[in-house]
């Protein structure tokens, strides 16, 4: 009974999501990455990486060198629709998916910089479960937002089933440390707000001289600017000479005296003016007919033309907004009542700290439209603040983006562009471990971010490689025009090295024969926490963990003479770890600053060697027949055997 009570109390201490297999974390092997120069392209000094292999092993391979260095992560993992789990019951199905995500998100959290953030794109099958995992790994206090994306629209084909049509997908957005993360706002295109319907003719002058007219009048005068004088003469002459004319006489008079009639319907205008010419006083007549004539003289303009005029002159376009006695500042409220007493006068309140001045007229504040106009994708546009509901990112036409086909999984380049604009700057590192058709890497490349993309499937070559290659060659789909993409740059193509250890025919674990000396040295450096960077002239300095701590791996028998020779070359304060298959007994503990470890014995039990795939085969991406032919005929896997016998040279692929 006491036992049960204790367990209940313990359970109440922490609320958590659990699943089958939780806590049974694999001991991942930190593999090295081998460049395949055949599929690297462009700038040979590029830091961009395209990795073909299991993404959990690839993330582990990156962990040592990239922990805390990634500014933005976007992942679009399998949605777990159920079709891929037909052999499992519901509980196991969810457990598999949750376990897959938990392992990867844990490493992704490690890779993020303290200012970084992650976007996880999902549908409603697992989004709520995934949020609990993200809360656990990142902390609920680091949750930024749940973004709802309108990913599809109803069509005859997609709406045959009854019920509410599912149009949305979701992006969970978390910071590594919200206190270090930079919050950014963004404005997006929107329809022009027609409530801003007044215009200041002489905005550049002192506010005491401002002249106000309706926005429509300002626009019509702008497009008729070459005929305003003629319109003025026309109105004055017709008032002076035609007040007693009949409709037909007015029509004839206009026809004979003013070619301006060619731009409007003469009979319609004559009938209208006949009634207005009876108005006493020319000024009253002018007020009654000016806008009508101005409009009739205008032709072939559209709402887009009005929009462009407003955007170009937004600093002169305004609306009047109410001033709340409770919400506004004390001085603003004072000017409100002062302006009511003097309704024709504009009052100005200058503010400190770079804030815009406040203008009050006739008891209301003048709000300029300029704050709602920004340059978007190279042109001025009406904008509104971005919210967490994204309905303006179109999925239509994305099949052609990047020149690759990718059914049921391709994301718009515009979507990734927005994510990167919210979270990163040029030169920052972004990562996608479910690269798919390569959209994340494509957008990062065009936006001049550094990137790492990981993809297990064949589309790493058929889609990602070819897409990035065409981008470097200046393809112009997707966001290319919006960012003025001109081509250039490069990337390196990597594959995961095979497992370091394998079993021989007797069941004993041995160093994998596919490893040559350089690969083994790189692998041992990674295993022991050193960075593999062979010294130009000192052969035993193959890697280092600090300025004075080095590692040396050799497959040869280590003699005391060889060890003493190394010791003589070492500088004061330097330490060395030697990893070798065998060594002379006298070498053991000979020097206090040299540690000797035997391989493969030192590696046994550390990792899960020999496992190549942690993907659980959740989905198989569709490959077109033409793409499959390309894969079969033109693309070959990197030959590790060929690398094994190569000596280190300038032509040797990079080991990472």
PLM regions: where:
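DnaQ-like (DEDDh/DEDDy) 3′-5′ exonuclease domain used for proofreading
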Residues: 1-72, 81-103, 271-360, 580-583, ...
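Active-site-adjacent helix-turn-beta-strand microarchitecture at beta-sheet edges
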Residues: 4, 12-14, 177-402, 413
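Conserved S-adenosyl-L-methionine
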Residues: 10-23, 94-102, 127, 412-485, ...
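Glycine-rich adenosyl-nucleotide cofactor-binding module
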Residues: 41-57, 61, 397-431
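Conserved proline-anchored active-site loop of SAM-dependent methyltransferases
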Residues: 68-83, 134, 430-444
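Conserved Class I SAM-dependent methyltransferase catalytic core
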Residues: 95-148
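Core SAM-dependent methyltransferase catalytic element
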Residues: 164-180
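PRPP-dependent phosphoribosyltransferase catalytic core
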Residues: 452-656
